[in-house]
Curated annotation (Swiss-Prot):
This is Prothrombin. GO terms for biological process: acute-phase response; antimicrobial humoral immune response mediated by antimicrobial peptide; cell surface receptor signaling pathway; cytolysis by host of symbiont cells; fibrinolysis; G protein-coupled receptor signaling pathway; ligand-gated ion channel signaling pathway; negative regulation of astrocyte differentiation. GO terms for cellular component: collagen-containing extracellular matrix; external side of plasma membrane; extracellular space. Belongs to the peptidase S1 family. It comes from Mus musculus. The record marks R200, S201, R311, T312, R360, I361 as: Cleavage. InterPro entries: GLA-like_dom_SF, GLA_domain, Kringle, Kringle-like, Kringle_CS, Kringle_sf, Peptidase_S1_PA, Peptidase_S1_PA_chymotrypsin. Changing S565A: Loss of protease activity. Pfam families: Gla, Kringle, Thrombin_light, Trypsin.
């Protein structure tokens, strides 16, 4: 008898409320209203009671048929009762055998539309991996855990939150297929599934290097084959034709690479591989489809004698671009007017330099004014909104991510007339008079081999400004790295810096002001080993990408987030005090999730493409 309790104050209040309502004109209560009055107050020590409730539920509703009120008596929560009752009514038609009934109640199989399904199938009926319900990549879901809180939208498991007539489904990781049904077992019908499995041909693509002996080293610099057609199917122009000879005259070609007939070659050591000139506008070129070995630049190719601690690297800066087409700024790039030019350091750059010697912004902090004078805001004209980040590389050219311009799954296909750039900004929303410059775009150039369909490979685009932008304390270009700088700095454990006005955290909140910063944010992130990057995701990683972020056991946190895309990942060289843009914020699976990292476009890998475009159209 020791567990028997009196009614107590909560019970008295409930009884008083009930008596009051009975004596009023509303003699009968709605079922939900009555149940809410009779609901018992939960106690902290409820382990025994939880077991008792489970026993009651099984006795009342599994061994026998029960009513909504009886289920509520066992569960004591309107929300839990509603969820249970929805499954119970669906599963009632398969009460026997008991095992099938329990499988249905516990969601291990689908009944009717499969609204009850809570299993772990996470591939569609054609074999496509499901997208995480909490993710916005590759598709922005209109259904999520906030819009459908009772639908058990966990991980990337197939569910039917909208009662689709085709059964459980999921958003897919294929950018060309938004959502697709899953093949899940049907309750009480052994061997039958909601839809038939019909795997697509081709299978999955694993993060594997090309087989040894079947790939070209040095990005095809030594290729002597007879391929004379580009990836896009265009025939190559002969190297000794007048257009090709005219264009080659001022190029820094390797004399050891023999330019024979119209065969694809790589005379300028383009990290993209072999290419050729093609007919069309003067200077048109295209890349050729050859199989290149994966060869890391920086990261694994590390020479201890050229380490930061050894200080043996040449500190002299050499320009790379033709000023006539590139514009002004390269000779002075990466030297910030308010810091390096005044021999001052910002508050956190020591963290970067220490990491060199020692071996989307979430959890970032407000940036000091002028800390990233190359930061650009890519702005949509109508509706007026921040679209992406970008970076200033000269007074005429801006660098950003291709997916900021073109990404069909999000209905993105912007032209020069849709966008403008805002340069020199610190505040996210306020117009900064006499500081920021607003510039129109003359032309957008997206990498021709940008792969939005699979993995955002070559996620890079160039924006040509209509007019050169004047430099100031708050407007100054960043440097693009050479091979020596990449080899010295792009090392696992070394930290780079990401800046942007992106979301402060990953969330589905409708109050956007809760997650958007008022000023530019900055975060310093360590580069991650390539095998760890590959192991962290099912998406195929190429050597045009690298990843950065904190590992599960690291005490510090931080990441880029939605809105930071297209912005720069920069590192400061201790040899010449210049800042170099090593990467472009490209993609990630959420923001600052444990075991997940941000992926960045490898700028050096695509530097020759940048040069060719600028030489042709500058």
């Amino acid at each position: 008898m020791s567990h028997v309790r009196g009614l107590g104050l909560p019970g008295c209040l409930a009884l008083a409320a009930l008596v009051s309502l009975v004596h009023s004109q509303h003699v009968f209560l709605a079922p939900q209203q009555a149940l809410s009055l009779l609901q018992r107050v939960r106690r902290a020590n409820s382990g025994f009671l939880e077991e008792l409730r489970k026993g009651n539920l099984e006795r009342e509703c599994v061994e026998e048929q029960c009513s909504y009120e009886e289920a509520f008596e066992a569960l004591e929560s309107p929300q839990d009762t509603d969820v249970f009752w929805a499954k119970y009514t669906v599963c009632d038609s398969v009460r026997k055998p008991r095992e099938t009934f329990m499988d249905c109640l516990e969601g291990r199989c689908a009944m009717d539309l499969g609204v009850n399904y809570l299993g772990t199938v996470n591939v569609t009926h054609t074999g496509i991996q499901c997208q995480l319900w909490r993710s916005r990549y590759p598709h922005k879901p209109e259904i999520n855990s906030t819009t459908h809180p009772g639908a058990d939208l966990k991980e990337n498991f197939c569910r039917n939150p909208d009662s689709s007539t085709t059964g459980p489904w999921c958003y897919t990781t294929d950018p060309t297929v938004r959502r697709e049904e899953c093949s899940v077992p049907v309750c009480g019908q052994e061997g039958r599934t909601t839809v038939v499995m019909t795997p697509r041909s081709g299978g999955s693509k694993d993060n594997l290097s090309p087989p040894l002996g079947q790939c070209l080293t040095e990005r095809g610099r030594l290729y002597q084959g007879n391929l004379a057609v580009t990836t896009l199917g265009s025939p190559c122009l002969p190297w000794n034709s007048l257009p090709a000879k005219t264009l080659s005259k001022y190029q820094d070609f390797d004399p050891e690479v023999k330019l024979v007939e119209n065969f694809c070659r790589n005379p300028d050591w383009d990290e993209e591989g072999a290419w050729c000139y093609v007919a069309g506008q003067p200077g048109d070129f295209e890349y050729c489809n050859l199989n290149y070995c994966e060869e890391a630049v920086g990261e694994e190719n590390y020479d201890v004698d050229e380490s930061i601690a050894g200080r043996t690297t040449d500190a002299e800066f050499h320009t790379f671009f033709n000023e006539k087409t590139f514009g002004l700024g390269e000779a002075d790039c990466g030297l910030r007017p308010l810091f390096e030019k005044k021999s001052l350091k910002d508050t956190t750059e020591k963290e970067l330099l220490d990491s060199y010697i020692d071996g989307r912004i979430v959890e970032g902090w407000d940036a000091e004014k002028g800390i990233a004078p190359w930061q650009v805001m890519l702005f949509r004209k109508s509706p007026q909104e921040l679209l992406c980040g970008a970076s200033l590389i000269s007074d005429r050219w801006v660098l950003t991510a291709a997916h900021c311009i073109l990404y069909p799954p999000w209905d993105k296909n912007f032209t020069e007339n849709d966008l403008l750039v805002r340069i020199g900004k610190h505040s996210r929303t306020r117009y900064e008079r006499n500081v920021e410059k607003i510039s129109m775009l003359e032309k957008i150039y997206v990498h021709p081999r940008y792969n939005w369909r699979e993995n955002l490979d070559r996620d890079i685009a160039l924006l040509k400004l209509k007019k050169p932008v004047p430099f100031s304390d708050y407007i100054h270009p960043v440097c693009l790295p050479d091979k020596q700088t990449v080899t010295s700095l792009l090392r696992a454990g070394y930290k780079g810096r990401v800046t942007g006005w992106g979301n402060l955290r990953e969330t589905w909140t409708t109050n956007i002001n809760e997650i958007q910063p008022s000023v530019l944010q900055v975060v310093n992130l360590p580069i991650v080993e390539r095998p760890v990057c590959k192991a962290s995701t099912r998406i195929r990683i190429t050597d045009n990408m690298f990843c950065a972020g904190f590992k599960v056991n690291d005490t510090k946190r931080g990441d880029a987030c939605e809105g930071d895309s297209g912005g720069p990942f920069v590192m400061k060289s201790p040899f010449n005090n210049r800042w170099y843009q090593m990467g472009i914020v490209s993609w990630g699976e959420g923001c600052d999730r444990k075991g997940k990292y941000g992926f960045y476009t490898h700028v050096f890998r695509l530097k020759r493409w940048i040069q060719k475009v600028i030489d042709q159209f500058g």
